[in-house]
């Protein structure tokens, strides 16, 4: 299967691209055809055949990560060529083997700081005027933003919904 790894490497975070991609090659979905789509504000001339650079504006952190779903939807034609896509924070590493068990329409990561907490303790958006509003007593899990993905049609639909809101 064809897999696309998405990440944002702006400002000083460009230094983490190589180590992330090395850990992906070593531990993530071995045996599959893996490519990367790197969103960056740096001028990069030489990249390998399996890495595509998408140039974005230079903006201070955390603006680029807040705009991630905007970037993804602008590259929907490219991302749609893959069987699965996964966003990974560029400063993470894959330390253990991850196999086909990760495949799903949409995949997300439970936030480790909230694993054993009751949903009343989750830091959901509680302002009713927000499009991210979760009423008291609702919600099942609290998700981390550093890793998510799935089949492109589902991932891009989710991304577009986030952009629209």
Model-predicted regions and their roles:
Residues 1-64, 75-81:
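N-terminal anchoring/stem segment of glycosyltransferases
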Residues 6-9, 38-41, 88-90, 109-111, ...:
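Short His-Asn-centered micro-motif
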Residues 62-66, 116-124:
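Short, charged, surface-exposed secondary-structure boundary motifs
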Residues 69-118:
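GT-A fold catalytic core of metal-dependent nucleotide-sugar glycosyltransferases
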Residues 123-140:
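Short, flexible, basic/aromatic active-site loop/helix in glycosyltransferases
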Residues 137-165:
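Catalytic core and acceptor-binding pocket of nucleotide-sugar-dependent glycosyltransferases
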């Amino acid at each position: 299967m064809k897999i696309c790894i998405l990440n944002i490497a702006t400002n000083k975070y460009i230094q983490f691209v190589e180590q992330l991609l090395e850990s992906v090659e070593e531990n993530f979905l071995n045996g599959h055809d893996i490519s990367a789509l790197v969103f960056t504000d740096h001028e990069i001339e030489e990249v390998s055949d399996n890495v595509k650079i998408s140039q974005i504006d230079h903006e201070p952190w955390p603006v680029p990560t807040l705009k991630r779903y905007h970037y993804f939807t602008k590259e929907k034609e490219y991302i749609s060529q893959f069987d699965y896509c996964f966003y990974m924070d560029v400063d993470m590493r894959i330390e253990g083997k991850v196999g086909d068990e990760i495949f799903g329409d949409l995949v997300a990561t439970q936030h480790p700081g909230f694993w054993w907490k009751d949903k009343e303790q989750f830091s959901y958006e509680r302002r009713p005027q927000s499009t991210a509003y979760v009423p008291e007593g609702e919600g099942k899990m609290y998700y981390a933003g550093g890793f998510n993905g799935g089949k492109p049609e589902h991932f891009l639909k989710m991304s577009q919904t986030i952009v629209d809101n």
